[in-house]
Amino acid sequence: MSLEALQQRLGYRFSKPELLQQALTHRSHNAMHNERLEFLGDSILNCAVADMLYGMFGKLDEGDLSRVRANLVKQQALYEIAQMLLLPDELRLGEGELKSGGFRRPSILADALEAIFGAVFLDGGFDAARTLIRKLYIPILEQVDPRTLGKDAKTLLQEYLQGHKIALPQYAVVATHGAAHNQQFEVECTIPKLEIRVSGSGASRRAAEQSAAKLALEEAHRLVPQLVKRSRAERTGKTRKQATPPDPQLSLRLKE
């Protein structure tokens, strides 16, 4: 198989192309598969991303750095990068896995990408692997907010309301639908001060709460600026009223 186009997309040329070929080989294809390279690449990825975050975000504490890193190295993030690199076209799969659509499976694509990182490390050393990882991740980091990346909707809503000194939302299950083994929960989220009342649904109470929180957060982002603007206008009006000096002519007329 020709790997020239993939090497161009990676921006790295292998001195041992067989390493790249192995990185793209699933265990269903033959014995020289990519699982050991994946194991190695996983560690390289975590180290390189940690180094990158440490240098880029000097104000984030250890907990936030760990949260951001976990979000960047999880399967979904790797899958999206693998899609961008057109890895589905390059995978070597066994016949059964190929027929079942393995080239579209997120886990297989994520594993192959980690294996590529491991292959680059063996071929060119840690600096080469780190350079590749930075090339792939810097554009992603430029588009995300590290303060919120990886936080769920309930957490984001709570932090947003606390930041504006608004009482926390209330959640209540208002309905359940379906058979016991396949229930759908409907949860209502209310924020009295903002007059927000929205509902979300999900296969579990937690999922339904997250769905409702996401909708409530969207509403809060729309309403809170209006509330702040109105509050400032009211304070400005009171200040002006208090600062207005008495009219001496009016005082004379009142005395008469």
Swiss-Prot record:
Residues 152-222 form the DRBM domain. Gene3D superfamilies: 3.30.160.20, Ribonuclease III domain. One of its GO terms (biological process) is rRNA processing. It comes from Ralstonia nicotianae (strain ATCC BAA-1114 / GMI1000). The keyword DNA damage does not apply. Its cofactor is Mg(2+). SMART domains: DSRM, RIBOc. Residues 227-256 are annotated as: Disordered. Keywords: Cytoplasm, Endonuclease, Hydrolase, Magnesium, Metal-binding, mRNA processing, Nuclease, RNA-binding, rRNA processing, rRNA-binding, tRNA processing. GO terms for cellular component: cytoplasm. Mg(2+) binds at residues 38, 111, 114. Digests double-stranded RNA. Involved in the processing of primary rRNA transcript to yield the immediate precursors to the large and small rRNAs (23S and 16S). Processes some mRNAs, and tRNAs when they are encoded in the rRNA operon. Processes pre-crRNA and tracrRNA of type II CRISPR loci if present in the organism. This is Ribonuclease 3.
